[in-house]
């Protein structure tokens, strides 16, 4: 994230809660890279202040009076695309609306705690600062590219009745890790795959209330079965397993099959689920029988794990910088020479299918 280093980014905080506005202003102004230029209590105030102040990034509450945050976001992305970080409640409804917001163009989200708002948010201060700075630094052309991809996705109809999956085990395994921008990237990647592939395990940095909604949403629109991973779940052909938020996902080999293992061990690289934890478990469980892709994301989680997979003989891919919303995790992997191939997102699915065609099992 060196580009834009030294610049001070203008932030507009949009939230109907005066307390939340106050807390966010205090947190964001702690960073020398950020300046909160104003706040707005509803989308109509926000619209006027965006015109007057031209902020670099806005934080936007999902639930607001007069016009809900989702409607405002859709209008904003249609008329004036800009980086938006959503502020969402940790509820099932909040998760569903936030996933909608990411599909309509929001870059990332921050989950509000259900209780003890001030203490809970202040514990996330560094995460909030990092996410807002990361969003502000996204080039305008990448925002436009994201919008184009989303429009293409919206034009695709939901899947009809899917064929029954074959509950067959396999020697092969596919792993994916992602963070910021990863929800869109994972959806696009899976959209290019099919049921005739080994089981796919995914670690995406996501809170607990969101992972199930994300898995259910993918399951409705993709031909393969997508589910939130559970402890001892057998990993079978044509199925996708999403790590549940607040749990590490590991893969272990039991006899002739792979199974999921969940753990509440401490966060790794500040994350649980951690991509490194998933990848490291696959080094032991599958080694050269695996392939792994590290997609867009902030930080370096997964880079060291991808290197260890590479050294174990697995086929490894890092998403390229041009197609990544944030080239943190895959960029760190490239610096470690952990990737066999560095590919744009739209070419990764074809490489996964080619790898399996050349290495069936």
Swiss-Prot record:
Its EC number is 3.1.1.61, 3.5.1.44. InterPro entries: CheB-like, CheB_C, CheY-like_superfamily, Sig_transdc_resp-reg_Me-estase, Sig_transdc_resp-reg_receiver. Residues 167-359 form the CheB-type methylesterase domain. The active site is at 179, 205, 301. Its main location: cytoplasm. GO terms for cellular component: cytoplasm. It comes from the Bacteria. It is an enzyme of class 3 (hydrolase). Coiled coil: none annotated. GO terms for biological process: chemotaxis. Residues 10-127 form the Response regulatory domain. Keywords: Chemotaxis, Cytoplasm, Hydrolase, Phosphoprotein. GO terms for molecular function: phosphorelay response regulator activity; protein-glutamate methylesterase activity; protein-glutamine glutaminase activity. The modification 4-aspartylphosphate is found at residue 61. Phosphorylated by CheA. Phosphorylation of the N-terminal regulatory domain activates the methylesterase activity. Involved in chemotaxis. Part of a chemotaxis signal transduction system that modulates chemotaxis in response to various stimuli. Catalyzes the demethylation of specific methylglutamate residues introduced into the chemoreceptors (methyl-accepting chemotaxis proteins or MCP) by CheR. Also mediates the irreversible deamidation of specific glutamine residues to glutamic acid. Belongs to the CheB family. HAMAP family: CheB_chemtxs. Contains a C-terminal catalytic domain, and an N-terminal region which modulates catalytic activity. This is Protein-glutamate methylesterase/protein-glutamine glutaminase 1.
């Amino acid at each position: 994230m060196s580009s834009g280093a030294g610049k001070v980014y203008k932030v507009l905080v949009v939230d109907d809660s005066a307390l939340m506005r106050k807390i966010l202003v205090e947190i964001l102004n702690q960073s020398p890279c950020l300046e909160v230029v104003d706040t707005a209590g509803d989308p109509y105030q926000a619209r006027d202040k965006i015109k007057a102040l031209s902020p670099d990034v806005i934080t936007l509450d999902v639930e607001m009076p007069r016009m809900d945050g989702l409607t405002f976001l859709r209008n904003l992305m249609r008329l004036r695309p800009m980086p938006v970080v959503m502020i969402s409640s940790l509820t099932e409804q909040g998760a569903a609306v936030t996933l909608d917001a990411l599909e309509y163009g929001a870059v990332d989200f921050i989950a509000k705690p259900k209780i003890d708002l001030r203490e809970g948010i202040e514990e996330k201060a560094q995460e909030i600062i990092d996410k807002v700075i990361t969003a502000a630094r996204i080039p305008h052309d990448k925002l436009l590219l994201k919008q184009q991809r989303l429009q293409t996705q919206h034009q695709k109809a939901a899947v009809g009745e899917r064929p029954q999956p074959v509950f067959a085990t396999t020697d092969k395994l596919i792993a994916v890790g992602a963070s910021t921008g990863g929800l869109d990237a994972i959806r696009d990647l899976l959209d290019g795959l099919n049921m005739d592939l080994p089981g796919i395990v995914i670690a995406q940095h996501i809170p607990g209330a969101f992972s199930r909604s994300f898995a259910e949403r993918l399951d409705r629109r993709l031909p393969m079965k997508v589910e939130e991973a559970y402890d001892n779940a057998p990993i079978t052909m044509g199925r996708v397993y999403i790590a549940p938020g607040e749990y590490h996902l590991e893969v272990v080999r039991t006899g002739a099959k792979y199974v999921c293992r969940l753990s509440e061990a401490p966060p790794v690289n500040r994350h649980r689920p951690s991509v490194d934890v998933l990848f490291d478990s696959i080094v032991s469980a599958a080694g050269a029988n695996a392939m792994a892709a590290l997609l867009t994301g902030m930080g370096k989680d997964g880079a060291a794990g991808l290197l260890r997979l590479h050294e174990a003989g697995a086929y490894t891919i890092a998403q390229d910088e041009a197609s990544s919303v944030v080239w943190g995790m895959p960029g760190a992997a490239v610096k470690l020479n952990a990737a066999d191939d560095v590919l744009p997102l739209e070419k990764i699915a074809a490489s996964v299918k080619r790898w399996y065609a050349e290495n069936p099992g």
